[in-house]
Amino acid sequence: MEIVDGSQRLRTIRDFMADKVTLRDLETIPAANNFRFSDLPNSRQLKFAETPIRVIILDNTTDAVTRTEMFARINTGGTTANDAEVRRGSLPGPFMNLIIELAKDPTFVALTPISPQLVDKREREELVTRFFAYLDSFDPTLNDGEGDIATYKEEPRRFYFSFVKERNDRIAAELDSGGISPTIDAMRTDFTSTLDFIKAVSPHGFTKSETGNQVPRVRFESIAVGSALALRVDPTVVDRVSDMTPLLSSNEFSDVTRSDAANVKSKLLNRIRLTRNWLLAQ
């Protein structure tokens, strides 16, 4: 059995109970500084030894998605890794490399002014992941032509994870067979053309104002994915639309980009379709 999370803490506890280490630099209980385990009263030693430790065992049959779910749940102390960080660590591959690359794209950075803290938490990688997951999973032929994301079951963590894994595998297979990946080329083109369009028609990029330093995910999804879908249907949207302000300042846009219950499928589809339909109607 291999300890994959918490190994250092468990070894420290073991060594303390074996009298191999001495307590140092304690702040909460400074009176215990310079104590070894054997220096504690017998009753305290017994209580320490009988304190339960929660252990979760994942066997070889546990799938990758479940592993990620479990790591997210057990990582409840200290600094918790968010979903983007967990995916980055557990899903290495060519698509993940593309996500990391595009998250640093100068145009994308300019259109998504966020705090250094959010940058450190991989927020831009989260936005790039959502862009591709929703865009490439959207089937415009479903739901009487309104389009749908059939694989989205209101479990966003599993949805994003499964999408990244599938794209990693697909792109790796393409690279292995021919040395090039049409999928990567198409995704990079979609991303770049969408950013160029948003830069031209949205005065404040993905923010709400000129001085804005926040990019609400629901706002980003509506603008980015909706625009990309419209460009796929009719590339001449680039020539016909010069300003998205009438849409972005409308009550309808405000309504569909509220953050409450944002992961509900109907709300996700409504905010994506609104931008797409508005652009195509111009």
Predicted regions and their residues:
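Basic- and aromatic-enriched surface patches that contact anionic nucleotides/nucleic acids
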Residues: 1-162, 238, 242, 246-247, ...
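C-terminal subdomains that position terminal phosphate/3'-OH groups for nucleotidyl transfer/ligation
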Residues: 134-282
